[in-house]
Design a protein with these regions (language model features):
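Short, intrinsically disordered, low-complexity terminal/loop segments
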Residues: 1-3, 93-94
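N-terminal, charge-rich interaction modules
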Residues: 2-10
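Short aromatic-glycine-(Arg/Gly/Cys) micro-motifs in beta-strand/loop hairpins
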Residues: 9-37
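Local beta-strand/beta-hairpin segments that build beta-sheet-rich folds
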Residues: 38-42
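Short, compact, well-ordered microdomains
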Residues: 55-94
Length: 94
């Protein structure tokens, strides 16, 4: 189910919520298998992290994730690149 199908008046994203942008160590744009967790890139708000993520090269987006407090059905504790892209598309409607 896509995020767009979950939208109603009760769904709201707090873009000022604390969040961290993290990147998985990589070799040739692929996650390095020898690591067990991503490292910190940005410690700020969800908005800060989304902006920094979108500024990264598209070919590297799969290496990044955003960690934040869950917010209903729209925002989970760990946001993958595809989830971040959906939130960016919905942002103008929220």
């Amino acid at each position: 189910m896509s995020l767009a199908s979950n939208m109603d008046d009760r769904n709201h994203i707090d873009f000022d919520a604390p969040a961290t942008l993290r990147k998985w160590p990589s070799i040739k744009n692929q996650r390095a298998s020898a690591t067990d967790r991503p490292y910190l890139i940005v410690d700020g708000t969800l908005d800060d992290c989304i902006r920094q993520f979108m500024a990264k090269p598209m070919g590297q987006h799969q290496l990044y994730e955003i960690h934040t407090a869950p917010q209903g059905e729209l925002v989970s504790a760990v946001l993958s690149a595809s989830h971040i892209h959906e939130i960016v598309q919905l942002r103008d409607f929220l």
